[in-house]
């Protein structure tokens, strides 16, 4: 997405980008297609800045000496035939979801999982030498018969740590942070905390585990609370409906719930490459789903250009989606409550 933002910084709707990234020990590989001007030096600088900002300065992956292989090349003329007139960049189906479980209309489990790792990052960047930049979490909620979250049953958190840190100290340190994040009324004496279950976690990030664009699409979205069409978001310009239509469906779902028309809503849409209008559209909710579907179809321009124009998507805003999910951040345009 940092490479995409380089392209989007020109704010030219004729530009295109589909950038894939592979990261492993001391190596970053970029591949994909773009339309526009990308200088190798600015791409190199953008990649190193991302790595530095995350905090990777370890022997096996350091922003200053990582080897960058840039295999980006021009967009296919065949694909351009469809997208230059703002037809969909590919076929596919996309889903959006919202629930009134949390203040930002996200499911409880993914919401609190994001808050945990967000706080770990904050503690680390405020000067803690215990934690490393690689971390992830998972929260298991129990629901009552009315589908309301009532307690947290289990919390899993794995975080990279200093090689000299005692594992029990790390576990206690991290558990204290987690308990400060989670609402007390969800946590009880039976709540289980599984922190670094395998024990030592010193070698982390791309040095310990190869990473590839699109390998974590559920943590990018709703944590499994909603179906997923399978298309990843990052690196894709907004003519790719994998991304832009997923943002549209989130906006629709959020506005339905925020307006009180339902307690939860799942929105599905699909497209064919080169075609402007959706192939299908439906809403499932605990409200009047049939009427909601008709109402939204009449109110919303669901063509790729309509989506792009509504959210002003030809802007360099995509790096801000790369951690803590693509949804639930009020400053992003598809999170606005302004449909009804």
Regions found by a protein language model. Give the residues of each.
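Short amphipathic alpha-helical face segments that pack within enzyme cores
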Residues: 2, 111, 115, 244-251
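Short glycine-rich or small-residue beta-strand-to-loop segments that form or flank ligand, phosphate
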Residues: 27-35, 94, 98, 156-160, ...
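N-terminal, positively charged regions that mediate nucleic acid binding
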Residues: 1-16, 23
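Glycine-rich anion/phosphate-binding loop at the beta-strand->alpha-helix junction
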Residues: 164-257
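Internal helix-turn-beta structural module
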Residues: 262-264, 268-340
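Glycine-rich, mobile lid/loop segments that gate access to catalytic sites or pores
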Residues: 17, 25-27, 45, 49-202, ...
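Short, charge-patterned binding micro-sites
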Residues: 16-37, 273-277
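Secondary-structure transition/capping motifs at alpha-helix termini
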Residues: 9-11, 257-263
């Amino acid at each position: 997405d940092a490479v995409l933002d380089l392209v989007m910084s020109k704010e030219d709707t004729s530009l295109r980008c589909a950038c894939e990234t592979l990261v492993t020990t001391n190596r970053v590989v970029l591949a994909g297609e773009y339309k526009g001007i990308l200088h190798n030096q600015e791409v190199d600088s953008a990649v190193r800045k991302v790595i530095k900002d995350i905090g990777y300065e370890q022997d096996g992956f350091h922003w200053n000496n990582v080897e960058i292989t840039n295999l980006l090349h021009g967009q296919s003329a065949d694909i351009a035939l469809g997208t230059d007139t703002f037809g969909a960049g590919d076929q596919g189906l996309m889903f959006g979801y919202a629930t009134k479980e949390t203040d930002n209309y996200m499911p409880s489990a993914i919401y609190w999982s994001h808050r945990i790792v967000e706080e770990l990052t904050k503690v680390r960047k405020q000067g803690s030498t215990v934690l490393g930049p690689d971390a992830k979490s998972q929260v298991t909620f129990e629901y009552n018969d009315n589908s309301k979250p009532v307690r947290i049953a289990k919390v899993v958190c794995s975080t990279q740590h200093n090689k000299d840190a005692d594992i029990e100290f790390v576990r206690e340190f991290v558990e204290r942070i987690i308990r400060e994040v989670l609402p007390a009324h969800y946590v009880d004496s039976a709540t289980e905390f599984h922190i670094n279950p395998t024990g030592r976690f010193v070698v982390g990030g791309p040095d310990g585990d190869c990473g590839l664009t699109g390998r974590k699409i559920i943590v990018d979205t709703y944590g499994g609370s909603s179906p997923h069409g399978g298309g990843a978001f990052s690196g894709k310009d907004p003519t790719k409906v994998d991304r832009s239509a997923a943002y549209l469906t989130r906006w629709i779902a959020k506005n339905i719930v925020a307006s009180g028309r339902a307690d939860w809503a799942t929105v599905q849409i699909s497209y064919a490459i080169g075609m402007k209008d959706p192939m299908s559209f439906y809403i499932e909710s605990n409200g009047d789903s049939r009427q909601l579907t008709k109402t939204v179809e009449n109110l919303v321009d669901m063509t790729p250009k309509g989506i792009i124009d509504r959210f002003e998507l030809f802007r360099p805003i995509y790096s801000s989606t790369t951690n803590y999910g693509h949804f639930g951040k009020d400053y992003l345009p598809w999170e606005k409550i302004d449909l009804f």
